A protein has these predicted regions:
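Terminal, non-catalytic protein-protein interaction segments that mediate quaternary/complex assembly
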Residues: 1-173
């Protein structure tokens, strides 16, 4: 997706309305969520613990920002989703989203700086994909806002590339 924004990151379905997408994106970006929200939105089918990327997310985001500021041409700005070493039979730790790679490029037309992302997914159920697309948009937005606050540059959201090694129709396929 050449320019990733809220419009093209929002895919509404029976499983994911805008409120539900926003809840999961905020949670997975490390924002605080209430017990009421957890009870209202979280279901095993929507991803369960396997789709929970929030562990240590504040530190992961800070690391990306530090990398982009101090090594702007580097490829060190990576968020890894697993929480540590996991065994193949630990379903909750077998995160579908494995890594998000962030990098900066210059827009050739107007020389603005763009924040881009490539997402690498171990597996992706098509019916869960809207949640992941919206999460990637949200984390890009969070990183972009923090970059703009911590630097004198003006960054805009750029491209998103979605890599999936195994694509299945539903979560239980």
């Amino acid at each position: 997706i050449q320019i990733f924004n809220k419009d093209n990151a929002t895919i509404l379905t029976d499983l994911f309305d805008l409120e539900t997408l926003d809840y999961y994106a905020r949670k997975n970006c490390g924002f605080e969520v209430s017990k009421t929200e957890i009870d209202k939105y979280e279901t095993e089918y929507r991803g369960g613990l396997q789709g929970d990327y929030s562990s240590e997310m504040d530190a992961k985001i800070d690391n990306v920002i530090d990398s982009l500021i101090n090594y702007p041409e580097s490829k060190r700005a990576v968020v890894m989703m697993n929480n540590g070493w996991w065994a193949h039979d630990d379903t909750d730790e077998a995160k579908c989203c494995r890594e998000l790679h962030f990098f900066l490029t210059e827009n050739y037309n107007d020389k603005t700086m763009l924040l881009n992302c490539s997402g690498i997914f171990r597996a992706q159920a098509v019916d869960i994909m809207p949640k992941n697309f919206y999460f990637v948009y949200k984390i890009m937005e969070v990183i972009n806002e923090k970059l703009n606050k911590q630097t004198e540059s003006k960054y805009l959201l750029g491209s998103y590339t979605h890599f999936v090694t195994i694509l299945v129709p539903t979560r239980y396929d």
